[in-house]
Design a protein with these regions (language model features):
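Structural helix-adjacent loops and short alpha-helical linkers that scaffold large soluble proteins
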Residues: 360-366, 404-418
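His/Met- and acidic-residue-enriched segments that coordinate or traffic transition-metal cofactors
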Residues: 376, 380-385
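Short, solvent-exposed loop/edge-beta patches enriched in aromatic
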Residues: 77-82, 399, 403-412
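Residue-level detector of conserved catalytic or cofactor/ligand-binding positions
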Residues: 423-429
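Well-ordered alpha-helical segments within folded domains of soluble proteins
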Residues: 390-405, 430
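Cell-envelope and extracellular/periplasmic
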Residues: 1-359
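Charged catalytic carboxylate motif
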Residues: 170, 244, 364, 396, ...
Length: 430
């Protein structure tokens, strides 16, 4: 079987993989073969050929191969005992539009802005030429069209976060166009929801979630909230995304009776001051590591003021409440730039971040905290009486904070901290 490893920016082991030495001890697999497509820009049209060669899977050949892709292939091989081929076609820091055929984009208003901004005539810096629409489709994917593949794995989204409101349609169009080019209308497409990070808005992960839940056949999303690093958009934990992508393939394509997704929000019921949520993929019940208190839930009333919620697990459901919210109407879990969340199912897979509200995701919030904030704290104490630190964020999570000296009011520097309580305001105050 062959699986292309598409657009994963975290391609090289030498950039730092968690427990790399141990992983390399389990990296000799003569029946796993690797094909690494060399970088090739083609802004003027589709190429018929690309450069690369098949090599055996071993520690030396893996130095320049996708760690996530390798973990994915290794898991398939161990579970299925059958030869596996992995084709890596990747270029870090690129947009989904770079990997989409121009035939899809040229007459579609959805792409008008990016076609103008990144046209080959306007892009002069060498490092930006990979962002020209269709250039990587033309040079690194089109040459493989027609080659027999079992499916695709995809790890991308960071570079599209500035246009997250368009990403669901952009990504859906990419999937459908690849399937059409290969004449495989149900070709599997498994992707990683990008890890939470202080620079990444919640909207991009929400767009990925909506893509999964849109009704497209044979797609699946791996969640990596537990592997996230607030300061590194490319977390060093490559085993979690690789094995979770493999779980989708094993369950959906090979009929393995395994759990392939973490808890997914299903429904909500309000009862006075409490909200009870039910989840799918929660057979055997919900849990937290070491039965610690649940982190990451917020509730709000009609005023759109979200407060941390106390959470009580009851089997596959969870009940939320807050002393600050007397009539809750909305819930958010892990919905923000970066959050410490800890809800899992019995299979050890993390819950999917979500929100039940329709408040604008780019609404501004005023942040309140006490004067004891430290860099990257685990929590803040809600304190309306002290405003030594304040700032604005486009959602809950880890965000830029402007330090203001209490005595003089001087603004000194930005810091990155984790916000656990936000007060909604309609407009940012300058």
């Amino acid at each position: 079987m062959e699986f292309p490893v598409a657009r994963n920016p975290q391609v090289k082991w030498k950039t730092g993989m968690l427990n790399e030495a141990e992983e390399m001890k389990d990296a000799d697999f003569p029946e796993i073969r690797l094909f690494h497509v060399e970088h090739q820009l083609a802004p003027d049209g589709e190429k018929e050929d690309c450069v690369g060669k098949w090599v055996v899977c071993n520690p030396e050949n893996l130095k320049d191969f996708s760690a996530v892709g390798f973990v994915f292939g290794r898991k398939l091989y161990k579970e299925l005992s059958t030869p596996v081929g992995l084709i890596q076609s990747t270029w870090g820091g690129t947009h989904a539009e770079s990997w989409t055929s121009m035939k899809v984009m040229e007459n579609n208003p959805l792409y008008a802005d990016v076609l103008k901004q990144y046209s080959k005539e306007r892009v002069s810096r060498e490092k930006d030429k990979c962002k020209v629409p269709a250039t990587l489709w033309n040079g690194m994917i089109a040459p493989m069209v027609g080659y027999t593949v079992k499916g695709n794995i995809w790890y991308q989204g960071e570079s599209n976060s500035v246009r997250y409101e368009k990403y669901q349609e952009v990504f859906t169009n990419l999937i459908n166009s690849w399937r059409k080019e290969w004449n495989q209308p149900d070709m599997p497409f498994y992707f990683v929801q990008i890890a939470p990070h202080y620079k990444q808005p919640a909207g991009i992960r929400e767009a990925q979630l909506k893509t999964w839940l849109s009704g497209l056949e044979n797609i699946g999303m791996a969640v990596v909230t537990d592997a996230a690093d607030s300061t590194d958009i490319h977390p060093r934990n490559k085993v979690a995304p690789g094995e979770r992508l493999a779980a989708w393939a094993l369950a959906k394509q090979y009929g393995k009776k395994i759990v392939y997704s973490g808890p997914l929000y299903k429904s909500m019921k309000v009862n006075g001051r409490e909200i009870t949520l039910d989840f799918e993929f929660a057979e055997g019940g919900l849990q937290t590591p070491g039965n610690e208190p649940v982190k990451g839930f917020f509730i709000a009333g009609n005023d759109a003021r979200f407060y941390p919620a106390e959470a009580v697990i009851n089997g596959s459901s969870i009940t939320l409440s807050s002393t600050y919210v007397s009539a809750p109407v909305a819930v958010r879990y892990g919905y923000g730039t970066f959050f410490r969340v800890n809800l899992f199912n019995k299979a050890g897979l993390p819950a999917v971040p979500f929100r039940t509200d329709t408040f604008a995701p780019d609404t501004y919030y005023r942040l309140f905290a006490d004067s004891e904030i430290r860099r990257f704290p685990e929590a803040w104490q809600l304190d309306h009486g002290k405003r030594l630190y304040f700032g604005y964020a486009q959602g809950v999570g880890c965000c830029a904070m402007l330090q203001v000296w209490k005595k003089t009011g001087d603004r000194r520097y930005f810091d990155y901290v984790e916000a656990l309580s936000l007060i909604h305001i309609s407009e940012p105050t300058r």
